[in-house]
C-alpha cells in the first residue's frame, strides 16, 4: 500500500505517471530500449525534449517572446546565474521572505553585484509577505513566489517597471500566472512538476541580450543554452522525460485554473482543521499570506507532542510531515499530485490526535 507523501521535495508524484514510467522503463513505446539509454541527439529524445518545452509554455499561455530552458544545478544555481547574466551597472533589488531569498542575496553579493534588500519579514521569522515597492530603474526586482519552509506565498506579484524575477520552485504549475512584467520565472521541478535534477527557466528573450557581451563561462550563460535549445551538453534525459509526463498529466487536469481550484480546496480544508482546533494547532504564517502548497504549523499547547505526531502519522501511513530543521514543528506539503481525499485523511488524523492528547 502506497504511503501518503507530504514531503516538501522531492515530493509525491501522480501514480499514473509512476506506472507509465514503470511500463516504459525498459522498453520505451515498444522501441526495444529505455529513454535513459539513448542519445539526447536522437529524434526520439528530441520529441520528448521539445514537446515538454512547448507543453510548459502552453500551460502558462506563453508565446514566442519567452524561451524555455532546461538546466541542471537546481534552483540554487540560479541564485548565481541570475545576477551573473542579468545585472547591469545599477542596483539589483530583492524582497527577503525566507531562507531561499537570503541565499539568493548572498550569491549576488559574492559576485560583487550592487544588491539592495527593499523589504524583509525576517524580524518576524518570515511569517508574512512584506509590503514591497521596487525602484523603476532597478536592474531587476527579485522575489520568491512561495516560501516552502515558512508556508507563505504571494497572493499577487508586485507590479514593477523593473524586470521581475520570480523563484517559483515550490508553486510551479500550481496556478495561473500573469507574465506581463515577468522577465524570468524559474524553479526546480521536483516539487510540483517532476523529479530532482532538472530546473525549468522561462526567460523573456530580450533579457538574453544582457548576457551577450559578458565574460561568463559558457555553461553559466543563458544565451548559450538558448542558442543550443538546452542541448549544449548532455541534459538530464530521464528527468526531462518525467517532466514531459507531468506536463501531459497537468494538461489532462484542464487549465491551471482547474489545478488552482483543487489546490485551494485542499489548503482550505487543512487550514480549517488548524483554525478550528481551539488553539491546539497553530499555523506559522499570517492568514492573509498563507501558502496553498506548504502548511507549516505547531502543536501550540505542547510542542513536545510534535515528534509523537510525526511518529503516529507515519504509523497511519503518512510520511514527510516533520517540519524543516530551521523552523521545526510540522509541515504538510500539499502539491499538485496530492488529492483531496489524502488531505482529508490527514485532517481526520489531526482531529483524532487532538482528541487523544489535548
Swiss-Prot record:
Query: What's the chief localization of this chain?
Result: cytoplasm
Q: Name one Pfam family in it.
A: Aminotran_5
Query: What Gene3D superfamilies does its record include?
Result: Aspartate Aminotransferase, domain 1, Type I PLP-dependent aspartate aminotransferase-like (Major domain)
List this protein's GO terms for biological process.
L-serine biosynthetic process; pyridoxine biosynthetic process
Keywords assigned: Amino-acid biosynthesis, Aminotransferase, Cytoplasm, Pyridoxal phosphate, Pyridoxine biosynthesis, Serine biosynthesis, Transferase
Binding partners and assembly? Homodimer.
Descriptive protein name: Phosphoserine aminotransferase
- Organism encoding this protein: Campylobacter jejuni subsp. jejuni serotype O:6 (strain 81116 / NCTC 11828)
